[in-house]
Amino acid sequence: MRHVQAETSPSSEPEAGPSQPAVRQGALQGGLLMGYSPAGGATSPGVYQVSIFSPPAGASEPPRALKRPAPPTEGPRELKRGPGLGAREGLSPEEPPTVGLLGPEGLGLKLGVASQHFCHHGLCVVEQGGSSTSPWTSGARSSPLPPSNASCSTLHTRDWASPDPRGQGSLGSSLGPAPPGQLHTLDTDLHSLAQIGGKSLVSGVGNGGSPWPRESPGTANGCSPEHTPPGPGPPGPCPTKRRLLPAGEALDVSSEDEGPAPRRRRGTLGHPPAANSSDAKATPFWSHLLPGPKEPVLDPTDCNPMGRRLKGARRLKLSSLRSLRKGPGLLSPPSASPVPAPAVSRTLLGNFEESLLRGRFAPSGRIEGFTAEIGASGSYCPQHVTLPVTVTFFDVSEQNAPAPFLGVVDLSPLGRKGYSVPKVGTIQVTLFNPNQTVVKMFLVTFDFSDMPAAHMTFLRHRLFLVPVGEEGNAGPTRRLLCYLLHLRFRSSRSGRLSLHGDIRLLFSRRSLELDTGLPYELQAVTEAPHNPRYSPLP
């Protein structure tokens, strides 16, 4: 069931039109004209009820409703709007009970001072208001409907101008016939009433008519129109309720409509998208009351680099003060932006040997399972230890030349002090392959008796293949490096000597291909730094 509420005010006698005869003089003074054309003939199930309120015409007779039988169905019906002011010329007083039907195409209802009740094929108009001596009130009467039909919560209030006595700018004159073949529903007509009302007011002023002075619906009677009972009121504009519009559509209403202040309308522009939806049924009516998103307040210091730098320094100072408040035991350095680590240079060093020992070549692979046994002898013999060896190999030549292996023995599992050795003695390092076969045993003699406390140095032990008889005169081009052992020593503050860091080894993956015509022998060379020989600990 759909409801619409409209209130009209009394007006003078309307003029007779040339299209219909004069009838119901004094009974139907102005009003609204609505039509309903069923799409399915006499079997349409939809029923619409329209309640119109008007001041009584001087009679104390209680409001009553009149039910009329449905007219015979005559093919498809179309909606036609007729004049909406009083009686028209061309209608005889003896019009049959089907008065209100403008021909067989549709149904036209004329609503005057005395409200009428009709029931025609899905349309029901209920009379609520004063009675009048009109042919519409003759016949069987039913009990009046409760006043609950007078309210409709889905409509907004809107001012309507009363019809002009001369018929200019009236609602009836602004309504035109619908295009042929177009079927209208009552819902569409009800929603179009608000726009038609606004247009009629403007046209009335343009033709010289003086519309009724407007006043706010909330101040007309001293109370809200929603809580005002239907009844006679002042001859001012009667508020009519219309459907709620979403916040986005409320801005499109013409300037004659009553609406929120301009400041309120501008505030609705910042609503979330859900409040600006065009679906009024899915949008809550209070969405325009929601607060808009707050714009972030920008600090003037954020606009320049100097301000940002000062703000960062202020934050660092505050954080340091908080840490000082916690106590000296909990003092932590102020948090600053992380300093990027220096880029590690991967350029090659002066020779191939140094580049391999420093890791300047990218390894081609890694071999697991190598181990190294470390021992020492001298003024005392420390316990031998066995540690894993990380072995990597390289592909540094396009030819089939052999490339050495690089083995690294990490001494960190032995503790911070490393592997303790005497100041004068011999160090033995034995390398085992994954099959636990000895690859090479290194024996290195050292003498660091003059090494001061808290200093460090290193030893590099090499094994070359040189031709026999050229041990002392063999040049670098005649020597072939076979094995290399790099040891690092450190003296503690108490003067104790130990191996620290790691031990690095170079060895060949297979036997060297030598010229069989010349005999070769191994030559061991141990080197240490000369100037300075010892360096202080960092």
UniProtKB/Swiss-Prot annotation:
Q: Which domain of life is it from?
A: Eukaryota
InterPro entries in UniProt: Atos-like_C, Atos-like_cons_dom, ATOS_Transcription_Regulators
Where along the chain is composition biased (Polar residues)?
1-12, 129-141
Q: What is its main location?
A: nucleus
What role does this protein play? Transcription regulator that may syncronize transcriptional and translational programs.
Biased composition regions of type Pro residues, renumbered to the chain: 227-238
Q: What PANTHER family would the database entry show?
A: ATOS HOMOLOG PROTEIN B, GH03947P
One GO cellular component term of this record is:
nucleus
Quick one: where's region Transactivation domain 1 (TAD1)? 436-444
| This protein's UniProt keywords | Nucleus, Phosphoprotein
Tell whether Nucleus is among the UniProt keywords: yes
Q: Belongs to which family?
A: Belongs to the ATOS family.
Q: Where is this region: Required for macropage invasion?
A: 348-430
On whether Phosphoprotein is a keyword of this UniProt record, the answer is: yes
Compartments where found: Nucleus
Protein name listed in UniProt: Atos homolog protein B
